[in-house]
């Protein structure tokens, strides 16, 4: 049961990190377009 919980936490962290990177990349792209 603990392993499943740890796996879920790790996957969630990776997912959040990917979302953050995607959002940052989008902001950079939009900024480059406007400048």
Swiss-Prot record:
Domain of life of the organism encoding this protein: Eukaryota
Membrane topology value: Single-pass membrane protein
Residues passing through the membrane, by range: 5-25
Xref: Pfam families: PetG
GO process annotations (BP): cytochrome complex assembly; photosynthesis
Electron transport as UniProt keyword: yes
InterPro entries on file: Cyt_6/f_cplx_su5, Cyt_6/f_cplx_su5_sf
Annotated function: Component of the cytochrome b6-f complex, which mediates electron transfer between photosystem II (PSII) and photosystem I (PSI), cyclic electron flow around PSI, and state transitions. PetG is required for either the stability or assembly of the cytochrome b6-f complex.
Protein name, entry field: Cytochrome b6-f complex subunit 5
Native organism: Cyanidium caldarium (Red alga)
């Amino acid at each position: 049961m603990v392993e499943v919980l740890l796996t879920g936490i790790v996957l969630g962290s990776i997912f959040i990190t990917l979302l953050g990177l995607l959002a940052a990349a989008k902001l950079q792209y939009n900024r480059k377009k406007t400048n």
